[in-house]
Each structure stands twice: as C-alpha cells, then as structure tokens.
C-alpha cells in the first residue's frame, strides 16, 4: 500500500505511543546510522540544525535529511574531514487504519468500527529549540556544512535554523 502523506503525522497529538511490546509488530526505522564521519578529530567549527516548532519527524524524513547532508559532505570534503550526528531517535509508533476501496468494499470492510489502526512506521517527536543534527568541519568546509544543513532542513516538516556553536569568530571572518 502507498505511504500516506507525512503531513498526516506531523502534529503532536496525544501521549507518546512507544511501547512496542504491546503491539503486533512495528516496522524497523529506515534510519540506522546516527553518527558518521571522523569522530576522533577535533574540528574548528561546529554547527547545529535546531527545530523552531514542535512536530513529529518520520523516520523516512530523518533518513532523507541524513543522506543529503552526508552525500554533500562526503563528495566535497572527504570522509576524514567532517563529523555528522543525528540526535533524535524515532520512538513514536505511527498507526494507520487501512480502508478497503473498490467495488464491493462496503461488504468486506467494517467502516470505522474498531478503527485503532496497525503500526506502519515510526517518528521522532521534536520540540522547539531541540537539536536535530550536529555537524563539525574545519574552516575550509564551513560554507559547505552550512549549505548541507540548510538542504537537510528543507526535507524536514518543521522550520529549522542553523546555529554556529563553535568557531563563530572564524565563520564571521569567512562571511558565513
């Protein structure tokens, strides 16, 4: 069945639904790698992607954002010249009440009776001011990191801002 639009699951409504031991089976999240690049090197500049509104980010959106940032940094900077970390983990289970369509569907389906829904995916709950991604680079790749984080923010359902947390004097001198 086709994946429903992410806007159906973006708003945070109700309590967290995370207890997988009571569910019939939850699909694994598409995002599996949360830390990439060189973890040992001490980089000059650190930037963070910070959420500005509360929302739920589906695991597919987190993976799409991670892939876009990683591809841009890996191609231009190389694997040893950056560090990337994805902070939120998709714990929230998303349910969907599948409806039968087509000829004779009214005889098969029970409509909205017992419409709790089956688990179809997971999402991460994010609140205003929460850090979504952390990236670290040296001064020669600072502009590249800022552009990559901005591209990642486009793939997420909440408005985000890029904040320089380390090396702000260097980025100001570079005009970033």
Swiss-Prot record:
One of its GO terms (molecular function) is structural constituent of ribosome. GO terms for biological process: translation. InterPro entries: Ribosomal_uL16, Ribosomal_uL16_arc, Ribosomal_uL16_CS_euk_arc, Ribosomal_uL16_dom, Ribosomal_uL16_euk_arch, Ribosomal_uL16_sf. It comes from the Archaea. One of its GO terms (cellular component) is ribosome. Keywords: Ribonucleoprotein, Ribosomal protein. Belongs to the universal ribosomal protein uL16 family. PANTHER family: 60S RIBOSOMAL PROTEIN L10 (PTHR11726). This is Large ribosomal subunit protein uL16. It comes from Picrophilus torridus (strain ATCC 700027 / DSM 9790 / JCM 10055 / NBRC 100828 / KAW 2/3). The lineage of its organism: Archaea, Methanobacteriati, Thermoplasmatota, Thermoplasmata, Thermoplasmatales.
């Amino acid at each position: 069945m086709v994946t429903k639009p992410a806007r159906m699951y973006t708003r945070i409504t109700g309590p967290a639904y995370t207890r997988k031991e009571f569910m019939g089976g939850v699909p694994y999240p598409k995002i599996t790698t949360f830390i990439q690049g060189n973890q040992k090197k001490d980089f000059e500049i650190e930037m963070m992607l910070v959420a500005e509104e509360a929302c739920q980010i589906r695991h597919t959106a987190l993976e799409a954002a991670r892939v876009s940032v990683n591809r841009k940094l890996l191609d231009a900077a190389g694997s040893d010249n950056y560090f990337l970390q994805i902070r939120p983990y998709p714990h929230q289970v998303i349910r969907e009440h599948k409806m039968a369509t087509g000829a004779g569907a009214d005889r098969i389906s029970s409509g909205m009776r017992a419409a709790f829904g089956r688990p179809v995916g997971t999402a991460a709950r994010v609140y205003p001011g929460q850090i979504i991604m952390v990236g670290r680079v040296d001064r020669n790749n600072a502009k590249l990191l800022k552009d990559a984080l901005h591209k990642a923010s486009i793939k997420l359902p909440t408005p985000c801002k890029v904040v320089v947390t380390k090396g702000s004097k260097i980025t100001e001198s570079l005009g970033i």
